Amino acid sequence: MAINTHYDHIGVQARKESAKLIMSKIKSIVGDRPAVVTGDFNITEDNEAYSTMVNSEFKMNDAYHMTAHHTGAPYTFHDYCRISPLKAPKIDFIFVTPNVKVLQSHIERETPTKRISDHNPHWADLEF
């Protein structure tokens, strides 16, 4: 199963509840089959909603941390290059169930002359 989401960028409670809802739905629909959840979560790794994704009873893994082969930028949001790479956050994630193997994870580096969004593309090679 593949799911894409875009969490609210203002409401802290909305993001917490979104994480709980997604985890509940995945658990009931997917069972023990592979699942991938991607999107703009508008959270960082120190956020409670992130913890819900990776520490719930039905656990998801952050693909970026599941391989030694993550390459590219350490951030995903640059606001059309208006945020310094030193301060830009990683708020886009690829979460996978434990039965999905992550072969590689990569976040493209955007430049003022090479950009398609206010976020860097983030991709992963997965094995099911």
Where are these regions (language model features)?
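Amphipathic, alpha-helical segments enriched in basic
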Residues: M1, V12, S28, T38, ...
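Metal-dependent phosphoester/phosphodiester hydrolase catalytic core
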Residues: M1-K16, K20
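Active-site beta-strand/loop signature of hydrolases that rely on acidic residues for catalysis
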Residues: A2-T5, I22-Y50, A63, F95, ...
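A short, polar/proline- and glycine-enriched secondary-structure boundary/capping micro-motif
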Residues: Q13-R15, K114-D118
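Active site of divalent-metal-dependent phosphoester/diester hydrolases
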Residues: D32, I43-R115
